[in-house]
Amino acid sequence: MKPRNSSPVTDAVTITCQLRRYEVNTVIFSAIIEEIRASLGLDDYQVGITFVGSRAIRTLNHQFRGYDKVTDVLSFPQIEWPKPVPMSKKPNIARRAARRSARIASRATVPLLLGDIVISIPQAAINAANIGQTLERELCFLVVHGFLHLCGYDHIAPKDEKLMLKVQREVMRNLGEDSRRPIWRNCVKATSGRRKRA
């Protein structure tokens, strides 16, 4: 898998797209990622986001999880987090997450690598079509979902899924889910997929 374009957007964020037929707007994705990091109290953590095709994510899913099938998002955490706990009726995710991440960050002398998120744009497009959403919104949702997995959230057990969905909804609201101009507008566009001649 050779990167089509890679951009170390900041010292803490790297965005790579390995597909010719899609162009990701690294400025918009950087803003999305910075808002997610702020929402979850992860300002001191580095993260990498890679956008791939169906074949690449299927290979990774088989290699690392034992599932020989295409999926939409994979997360590769580099930190073992304490298990997330349910929030009170009036959640303040940012405050709770900041305390949680500060405990881990306080032990480090250099910025910590939170992990890597790999997203299949073709699978995200299928998901978006199936649920009547835009590709842009679905990609943003998958970045949030991937971040939560990096932070130890999961959705296997019903109570864990309920907690993860609650946090996911709040972060999506912080990204403009309920506004007319969500942050993810124009974060990706389809291209012809052909190489430009010199």
Identify the residue ranges that each predicted region occupies:
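An acidic/histidine-cluster motif and surrounding catalytic segment
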Residues: 1-140, 150-198
